[in-house]
């Protein structure tokens, strides 16, 4: 094992000198043992001449001094993978941070892996059922696809993510991996405790590199989570759900690292390698003939500017977008998904079938018409509308309420049992409302129920 000596430390950037001919490869991991016995992992980023490498630290560089010895591991950062990591919380280098002792996994993967080869990819466009009505009907997720989850603070991103993890774990016996990238430590802590309470933790691996950590950790933690998910896909042939919260922080950390390495900034001060870094991550998230990694990525939009290079680069990779709206949350409709703003590439009759497609378009049409009429209603009131428009408004309001659904993970707050709604029941319910079969039922019957049969039964309790 080659050893070098630390020659310079500037924040998270550490230069190490090696003997001639012993330079580590780019992306190789080095370990430094501090005076208190703790180990620090560094990742090679640049070769500076014949004998010096510049590296980025995965933790704080407190306690490092010039002249310290750094050992080259000869390979990139390795993280534990397999079923042993389920129910555990790890950091970027795969060390447990949940106080439950070491992770006794038999296998480890490098965090830098090549994307699957072209001939290994599955070309079949297939829908991924989530059991959440508004998503399955209007912006269906594709198996092995990438979905962007947009929303401000407090509109229900985390609850939606937890419900997806719960549904995949219980209905499809699937595993989930959650990568917390540069978000608040408090949110990660809340998620950890809520997952333990709701019982979904045993089917989930959590990897965190939060906003108090150096940029090296934040720029790599998404790759750590992805490697864990890839193991389940490639070795066990499973369909895995990968959550990244927040993909913008991944770009932001890359920008910090780039500046520290002295690269010339690109548009809006971002790194010149922005699209390459995003592409390397997103290209690995895909379906193969063995299994799939389906990802849901929360995306923070800086200053609500969708043309900012960071969200704009992420958009090019997405198959579907789920937009959470504060206006809908204010109506008390949860999940607060905006049915008109959210999109999906597979909302296509050739993929999902004519029945599903026609129902989804009819729902969007009636909601759009209701939206157009809202100004008239606000100024003149309902009485000024034609009879046809009154009927449209009545049905649209029922549709809007029927898009809400009680969640398993929110049972403690709503007092209602959670519901997983199968796609055929979702389509059947909305078709009946639009066809006018339930015009005689009050709006309240459709609020926070699962299937249309439950709405009909609820009338008796009102």
Swiss-Prot record:
Origin organism lineage: Bacteria, Pseudomonadati, Chlorobiota, Chlorobiia, Chlorobiales
Entry's family note: Belongs to the ATPase alpha/beta chains family.
A single Gene Ontology CC term: plasma membrane
Annotated positions binding ATP: 151-158
Name the record gives this protein: ATP synthase subunit beta
EC number, UniProt record: 7.1.2.2
Provenance organism: Chlorobium limicola
Pfam families, per the entry: ATP-synt_ab, ATP-synt_ab_N, ATP-synt_VA_C
Catalytic activity from the UniProt record: ATP + H2O + 4 H(+)(in) = ADP + phosphate + 5 H(+)(out)
Membrane topology (UniProt): Peripheral membrane protein
UniProt cross-references to InterPro entries, sorted A to Z: AAA+_ATPase (IPR003593), ATP-synt_VA_C (IPR055190), ATP_synth_F1_bsu (IPR005722), ATPase_a/bsu_AS (IPR020003), ATPase_alpha/beta_chains (IPR050053), ATPase_F1/V1/A1_a/bsu_N (IPR004100), ATPase_F1/V1/A1_a/bsu_N_sf (IPR036121), ATPase_F1/V1/A1_a/bsu_nucl-bd (IPR000194)
Major subcellular site: membrane
Protein keywords: ATP synthesis, ATP-binding, Cell inner membrane, Cell membrane, CF(1), Hydrogen ion transport, Ion transport, Membrane, Nucleotide-binding, Translocase, Transport
Assembly behavior: F-type ATPases have 2 components, CF(1) - the catalytic core - and CF(0) - the membrane proton channel. CF(1) has five subunits: alpha(3), beta(3), gamma(1), delta(1), epsilon(1). CF(0) has three main subunits: a(1), b(2) and c(9-12). The alpha and beta chains form an alternating ring which encloses part of the gamma chain. CF(1) is attached to CF(0) by a central stalk formed by the gamma and epsilon chains, while a peripheral stalk is formed by the delta and b chains.
Record keyword Cell membrane present: yes
Subcellular location(s) per record: Cell inner membrane
């Amino acid at each position: 094992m080659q050893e070098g000596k630390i020659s310079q430390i500037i924040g998270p950037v550490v230069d190490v000198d090696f003997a001639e001919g012993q330079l580590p490869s780019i992306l190789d991991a080095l370990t430094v043992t501090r005076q208190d016995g703790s180990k620090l992992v560094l990742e090679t980023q640049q070769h500076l001449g014949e004998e010096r490498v510049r590296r980025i630290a995965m933790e704080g560089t407190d306690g490092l001094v010039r002249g310290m010895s750094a050992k080259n591991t000869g390979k990139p950062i390795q993280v534990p993978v397999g079923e042993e990591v389920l129910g555990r919380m790890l950091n970027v280098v795969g060390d447990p941070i949940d106080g439950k002792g070491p992770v006794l996994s038999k296998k480890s993967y490098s965090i830098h892996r090549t994307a699957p080869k072209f001939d290994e990819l599955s070309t079949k466009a297939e829908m991924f059922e989530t059991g959440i009505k508004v998503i399955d009907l209007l912006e269906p997720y594709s198996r092995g696809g990438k979905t962007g989850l947009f929303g401000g603070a407090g509109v229900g991103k985390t609850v939606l993510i937890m419900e997806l993890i719960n549904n995949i774990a219980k209905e499809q016996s699937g595993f989930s991996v959650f990568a917390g990238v540069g978000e608040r430590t408090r949110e990660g802590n809340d998620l950890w405790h809520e997952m333990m309470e709701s019982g979904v933790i045993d089917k989930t691996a959590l990897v965190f590199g939060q906003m108090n950590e150096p940029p090296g950790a934040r720029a790599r933690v998404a790759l750590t989570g992805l490697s864990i998910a890839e193991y389940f896909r490639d070795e066990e042939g499973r369909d895995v759900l990968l959550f990244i919260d927040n993909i913008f922080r991944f770009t932001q950390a890359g920008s910090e690292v780039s500046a520290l390495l002295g690269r010339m900034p690109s548009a809006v001060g971002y790194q010149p390698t922005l699209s390459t870094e995003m592409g390397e991550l997103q290209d690995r998230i895909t379906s193969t003939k063995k299994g799939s990694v389906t990802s849901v990525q929360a995306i923070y939009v800086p200053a609500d500017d969708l043309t900012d290079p960071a969200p704009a680069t992420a958009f090019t990779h997405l198959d579907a977008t789920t937009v959470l709206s504060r206006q809908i949350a204010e109506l008390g409709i949860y999940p607060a998904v905006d049915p008109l703003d959210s999109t999906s590439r597979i909302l296509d009759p050739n993929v999902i079938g004519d029945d599903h497609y026609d129902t989804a378009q009819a729902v969007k049409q009636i909601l759009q018409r209701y939206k157009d009429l809202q100004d008239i209603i606000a100024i003149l009131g309902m009485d000024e509308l034609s009879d046809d428009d009154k009927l449209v408004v009545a049905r649209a309001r029922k549709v809007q309420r029927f898009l809400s659904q009680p969640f398993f993970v929110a049972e403690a707050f709503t007092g209602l049992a959670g519901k997983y709604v199968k796609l055929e029941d979702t389509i059947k319910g909305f078709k009946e409302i639009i066809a006018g079969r339930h015009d005689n039922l009050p709006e309240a019957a459709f609020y926070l129920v699962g299937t249309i049969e439950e709405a009909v039964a609820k009338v008796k309790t009102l």
